[in-house]
Amino acid sequence: MVKLAFPRELRLLTPSHFTFVFQQPQRAGTPQITILGRLNSLGHPRIGLTVAKKNVKRAHERNRIKRLTRESFRLRQHELPPMDFVVVAKRGVADLDNRALSEALEKLWRRHCRLARGS
């Protein structure tokens, strides 16, 4: 049976992990959210989240966006390529309801899978 846990090993934790992704990213985005990805040598995907207070004013909205993004990643982790991902929330993402945000994330994960197969 496939485990769908979200352990510490699946998270980008240090600034150097984020910098690694920002140096040469593959980009997939919508007007409200961008996912940057870069292949890693670990054999499994990892995720980091950036939701700036400048773009999403209210803490409960930032938390909702992060929670939905983590859940989307957790459910797709076994389908994703071994990449480090940084999810960047842009202005307007707080206006999306949960379903629209989940659908946008699914579309971006599929795009990253295609990009990884193509490289």
UniProtKB/Swiss-Prot annotation:
GO terms for biological process: tRNA 5'-leader removal. GO terms for molecular function: 3'-tRNA processing endoribonuclease activity; ribonuclease P activity; tRNA binding. Gene3D superfamilies: 3.30.230.10. Keywords: Endonuclease, Hydrolase, Nuclease, RNA-binding, tRNA processing. It catalyses: Endonucleolytic cleavage of RNA, removing 5'-extranucleotides from tRNA precursor. Its EC number is 3.1.26.5. GO terms for cellular component: ribonuclease P complex. The keyword tRNA processing applies. It is an enzyme of class 3 (hydrolase). It comes from the Bacteria. HAMAP family: RNase_P (MF_00227). Belongs to the RnpA family. Consists of a catalytic RNA component (M1 or rnpB) and a protein subunit. NCBIfam families: rnpA. RNaseP catalyzes the removal of the 5'-leader sequence from pre-tRNA to produce the mature 5'-terminus. It can also cleave other RNA substrates such as 4.5S RNA. The protein component plays an auxiliary but essential role in vivo by binding to the 5'-leader sequence and broadening the substrate specificity of the ribozyme. This is Ribonuclease P protein component. It comes from Klebsiella pneumoniae (strain 342). The lineage of its organism: Bacteria, Pseudomonadati, Pseudomonadota, Gammaproteobacteria, Enterobacterales.
